[in-house]
Amino acid sequence: MGDIRPQKFRHRIDTPPLRGVNIQRLFGSQRALKTVEDFTEFEQRAAYFDGDPVIATKKGVNILERGSQVHFMAEVQEEIMDFPPAPKLNIYGKLDPKKATEAELRGQEIFFGKAQCAACHMPSYYIDNLMHNLKTERFFKPQMVNGRMASADGPIKTFPLRGIKDSPPYLHDGRLLTLEDTVEFFNLVQDLKLNPQEKSDLVAYMRAL
């Protein structure tokens, strides 16, 4: 079944990269689909209809066979679309001190320390496959923006940070255009009190992932 909520109340999510999909376990706008195979079947059966059964009927149903077609599509996504190389990381997903810059090493210390990023983004892929509520309703009231009710989305999915520099924009709905924006967002939401140098070092570290 697709998302039958009125358009203005639906979640808007960024189109995520398919790289590293093999280590992810939450899919769909409501994160209710646990495997890429489930997501593939859902997209074929119920997506893109805007909750309108007439549109769904006009498109028709193209049901894929789970044991072969869905499986083969998943094989392509899971086996071929790996993360980009990260030559500065060791086998444990941490920086190799012989290859990293001073700024990157400082950023790594902040990532695992003061910024608390590793509470959700754990090496070696920097993901925990869970949902976390940042409680952003503390900062604004729901309001209509371009025909959509913008509000706090509650728990959001933890995305992997490997190759993060190559996949802007950021956050679940693409509201943060750069890594600098993202660091500042979490600095405010978590009340981290990072200074300009710490924020710069943290960005340098994430660019090395």
Describe each PLM feature range:
Residues M1-L209:
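Periplasmic c-type cytochrome electron-transfer domains
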